[in-house]
């Protein structure tokens, strides 16, 4: 794998999987690899940003934390870019932008994700689309082998598949990797020349890699009733079955696969209470499942982020640690350290306070529903944007 200190756009036509044949990157700027800025200037400073949210978090083997989200413009749209920051003191202080992915023109970078693979490499994923949504988008990634360094060297950007991937991949017992990549059930919101219709590929798609991420191929798809943006996550149960949870208008839909993700059961509404927003689920080192959802009194608001545990693969849930009860908190993502500490990141008030926040806690805190452990921390500010709109 080649690494660069300065990453420049390259054509990636050979990697494209769009329906009806791949147009040339020159004719479709969303297919061009964007510049990856490893020395962001003042134009990306906190005091320039009017909007930010949708964060992800990861932890290197030496304890270095990484946080990622997207910002740019006044909201979701063509001015969006992805921002990466880091902390070398367990989240007490955070750097300014270390990497910015900012495609030129009306192409945006959004819904980013961080993930350490089993080899210890840190992947930085993002979606790329012409304007807000072009009907196809695309999952892109850069990778580093030295995520413990404050300024790691990154690979050149690569387009992995169509769709949008904002949640971490799942490594199966076989060693295969599954990546959730959604094609939204929405008409393209851009001009006709840059609009696409992927037809039956619209859904909660699953991409497969058998070679540690070198190549990805379409494996299968689940469809749940009243799906919205999918934002699906997959866990492998102890019996080997795959359980997919999908964002839906009523909260969370679900589907099961007994053949490694090739085919999926008819989607249905799950029994997990939640609102129309992203959730987070992950298997912990203990074998228990951690689930973070919204549990507001009215059943609708993006408030009351709560963490629960399951020791029976999601049949029942115990505990209940209130992460943040305020209106406007959303989009949790998390990672567990070897010492058992769970780091959770989420956003608060994307166009108001514009905060990216972190919490740290343990399984015992979740089980008891209280912030008891010495490692427990609430509402740690990772970043706050302070830009002011021009009058």
What are these regions, as identified by a protein language model?
Residues 6-18:
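Bacterial N-terminal signal peptides
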Residues 1-5:
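Positively charged n-region of N-terminal signal peptides that target proteins for export
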Residues 24-391:
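Asp-box/BNR beta-propeller blade signature and adjacent active/binding-site loops
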């Amino acid at each position: 794998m080649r690494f660069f200190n300065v990453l420049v756009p390259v054509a990636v036509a050979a990697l494209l999987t769009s329906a009806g044949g791949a147009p040339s990157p020159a004719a479709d700027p969303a297919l061009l690899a964007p510049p990856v800025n490893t020395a962001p200037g003042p134009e990306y400073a906190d005091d320039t940003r009017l909007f930010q949210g949708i964060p992800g978090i990861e932890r290197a083997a030496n304890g270095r934390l990484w946080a990622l989200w997207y910002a740019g413009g006044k909201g979701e749209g063509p001015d969006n870019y992805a921002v990466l920051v880091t902390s070398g003191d367990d989240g007490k202080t955070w750097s300014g932008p270390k990497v910015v992915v900012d495609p030129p023109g009306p192409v945006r970078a959004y819904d980013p994700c961080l993930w350490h693979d089993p080899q210890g490499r840190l992947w930085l994923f993002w979606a790329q689309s012409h304007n807000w949504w072009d009907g196809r988008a695309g999952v892109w990634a850069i990778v580093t082998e030295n995520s413990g360094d404050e300024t790691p060297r990154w690979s050149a950007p690569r387009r992995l598949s169509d769709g949008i991937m904002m949640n971490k991949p799942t490594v199966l017992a076989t060693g295969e990797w599954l990546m959730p990549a959604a094609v939204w059930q929405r008409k393209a919101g851009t001009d006709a020349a840059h609009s696409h219709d992927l037809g039956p590929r619209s859904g909660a798609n699953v991409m497969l890699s058998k070679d540690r991420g070198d190549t990805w191929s379409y494996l299968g798809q689940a469809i749940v009733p009243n799906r919205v943006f999918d934002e699906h996550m997959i866990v492998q149960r102890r019996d080997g079955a795959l359980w997919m949870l999908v964002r839906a208008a009523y909260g969370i839909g679900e589907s099961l696969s007994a053949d490694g993700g090739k085919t999926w059961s008819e989607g249905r509404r799950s029994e997990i209470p939640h609102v129309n927003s992203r959730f987070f689920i992950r298997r912990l080192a203990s074998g228990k499942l951690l689930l973070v959802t919204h549990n507001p009194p009215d059943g609708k608001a993006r408030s009351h982020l709560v963490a629960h545990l399951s020791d029976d693969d999601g049949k029942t849930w115990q505990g209940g640690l209130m992460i943040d009860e305020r209106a406007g908190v959303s989009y949790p993502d998390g990672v567990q350290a070897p010492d058992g500490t769970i780091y959770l990141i989420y956003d608060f008030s994307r166009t108001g306070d514009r905060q990216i926040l972190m919490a740290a806690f343990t399984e015992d805190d979740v089980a008891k529903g209280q912030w008891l452990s010495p490692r427990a921390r609430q509402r740690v500010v990772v970043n706050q944007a302070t830009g002011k709109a021009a009058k």
